[in-house]
């Protein structure tokens, strides 16, 4: 089982999103919830926008909390992140197992029932994402190397979510990714972030989802021409499980009251 968290947007102490959202407190509550799950995830993947401004100090703060997870965790970049600062803080840890000399932060995780490929869609200085030829070649090589069931994690969705302001800053070259994946039937799912909402769809014939943020969410408004708005809907994370027959994803929102058995 994989716990996916995304869009943490952690800032320095005392710095709140829009003057209201303590994103570090939201991350702490999320991590506590994951540690308390009755079914222990094998790993946690933080799928981008870990920091809000990409400073080393923010990543040190994030690491101080993620290090308290009781299972291994991995980090990926989003459009708010800095590769250099992530390498500085996570580069010598299992959380960022990139190869020496590798420009982009991409890597594979081997689990007993599943292979996970984490992609780097960061396009420096832009809100939208991109997969350059080097990153696509890396993915092609990884998919050619193994026929095991494989799940892809990437920050920017390659598909529309229906919110115009977010669709304008999705992955910029989804057709290149779709064309590559068409030759690999062992890719059983895609998991994304970026949108700050839970979304489920099928893209290029593959089940795909978007993870909510543990902090603020993007307001659900599908009308064209409307500005992006944020909302204090409950934050959450996703739990992905896979067996011989299916990939299943659950949305975990919180905090919630303790479960009470039926009488």
Regions found by a protein language model. Give the residues of each.
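Short glycine-enriched, charge-decorated loop/helix-capping segments at active-site entrances
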Residues: 16-21, 163-170, 224-226
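Active-site-proximal beta-strand elements of phosphoester/diester hydrolases
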Residues: 1-12, 113-123, 151-153, 206-212, ...
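Extended active-site neighborhood of metal-dependent phosphoesterases/phosphodiesterases
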Residues: 55-140, 176, 182-183, 204, ...
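N-terminal active-site segment of His-dependent metallophosphoesterases
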Residues: 1-61, 104, 161
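Active-site environment of divalent metal-dependent phosphoester hydrolases
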Residues: 11-13, 52-57, 79-87, 124-127, ...
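A cross-domain feature marking catalytic cores of carbohydrate-active enzymes
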Residues: 48, 77-79, 121, 154-156, ...
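His/acidic metal-ligating clusters that form di-metal
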Residues: 29-43, 128-209, 231, 238-239, ...
